[in-house]
């Protein structure tokens, strides 16, 4: 998360003293649209699942925007303001540890994210990576009753139509461990113990 404009906290402010400071954070704000009325719920649920499973993703939350009259999705920016991660090169993607890649792929299958590509995975050359942009996952752009819409898609199997994970494969053993991790609902500690 990027934080700017630091201001010291006064003795009587919430948060105390001891060198505390107030700051401004850079966030991305997303709203539902007529074409996709599920952006906010898709992002929120996918983010919470990723965090619970220990999958690297920037922290996000709901924000009730009074001017819009409905909740919006806000997510912390990674990097410096105005200096966003470019789409990672293949070398950066391959530097992501195999077990992390396998877990990210299993996560995409779980939430039925058919929109994974190099522009919505942030990666550097040191193996650090974060999955972002899940507005088309889960409920997709279902415009009717979400429960009925989900039932109509229960037999879908191709979560990687763009071939992103096929071009960045993990071994079958790593995939099996990632799938077991997700099925067991383990977080970061559970995954670390299965290496």
Regions found by a protein language model. Give the residues of each.
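AlphaC helix of the protein kinase catalytic domain
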Residues: 85-91
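Noncatalytic linker/hinge segments flanking ATPase motor cores
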Residues: 67-68, 113-121, 170-174
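Conserved ATP-binding subdomain of kinase catalytic cores across diverse folds
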Residues: 1-85, 107-113
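Conserved kinase catalytic-core segment
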Residues: 91-143
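Glycine-rich loops and low-complexity Gly/Arg-rich segments
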Residues: 52-55, 82-83, 98-100, 154-158
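C-terminal catalytic region of ATP-dependent kinase domains
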Residues: 128-195
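Short, low-complexity, polar/charged sequence segments that are solvent-exposed and flexible
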Residues: 47-51, 92-96, 149-153
